[in-house]
Amino acid sequence: MESKLSFESFFYNESKKAYFQKLMEKLDEEYEKYQVFPNKKDLFRAIELTNFATLKIVIIGQDPYHRKGQADGLAFSTRTKILPPSLRNLFLEIKNAYPNFSKENGNLENWAKQGVLLLNHVLTVRKSSPNSHKNIGWEVFSSNLINFIVKNKVDIVFLLLGKKAKLAVKNINLEKQKVFAYSHPSPFSFAKSLKNSMVFRKINDFLKEKKRLEINWNL
């Protein structure tokens, strides 16, 4: 049964729903009137790069980076040379768990290809306006995507970073999954619980326990 399921099949079914069509219409207007991130071609990059059959981890963020050139369609990832503070703190926490960690850029594409779904709860944002695309339909899309995963998979690692990520799964049954919940890596909240949590090692320990390939965070 699972072999027939894919993110492509999920997207095809979702795209026929009324809320999704309204969301796409709204986004057409937004892209026409404002600078919106990420680029349209990168909107669904998270589910394009990660294979449902080999999915291991779901990392849930809030909404994309709102400065020009930063957002690339993957939560926390960026193509810019200068790392946004949240990503810099994530890397600090990985280095805390793996002292030899030395990733030189913020492009997390290879995490996605290893089975890490990097999902923002809201997938778009206006330039310099965080939360500007709240309640236009993305929350429904993200919740439906997470439900699709938990109904068809077990032992998926969910890393929830921040209050909004926790709210994203509030009404979803994650009993058959492995959940890690910590503060957001932003400078304002990093130290609350994410810092020194060793969560990236804990994730790999869990994968190892389940006899699955560990994630190489350096890639």
From Swiss-Prot:
Active site: 63 (proton acceptor)
The protein's Enzyme Commission number: 3.2.2.27
InterPro entries xrefs: UDG_fam1, Ura-DNA_Glyclase_AS, Uracil-DNA_glycosylase-like, Uracil-DNA_glycosylase-like_sf
Entry keyword set: Cytoplasm, DNA damage, DNA repair, Hydrolase
GO cellular component: cytoplasm
BP GO terms, sorted: base-excision repair, AP site formation via deaminated base removal
Enzyme class: hydrolase
Gene Ontology terms, MF aspect: uracil DNA N-glycosylase activity
SMART domains: UDG (SM00986), UreE_C (SM00987)
Pfam families: UDG
Keyword Ubl conjugation: no
Subcellular location: Cytoplasm
Catalytic activity: Hydrolyzes single-stranded DNA or mismatched double-stranded DNA and polynucleotides, releasing free uracil
Superkingdom field: Bacteria
Purpose: Excises uracil residues from the DNA which can arise as a result of misincorporation of dUMP residues by DNA polymerase or due to deamination of cytosine.
HAMAP family registered for this protein in UniProt: UDG
Family: Belongs to the uracil-DNA glycosylase (UDG) superfamily. UNG family.
Name assigned to this protein: Uracil-DNA glycosylase
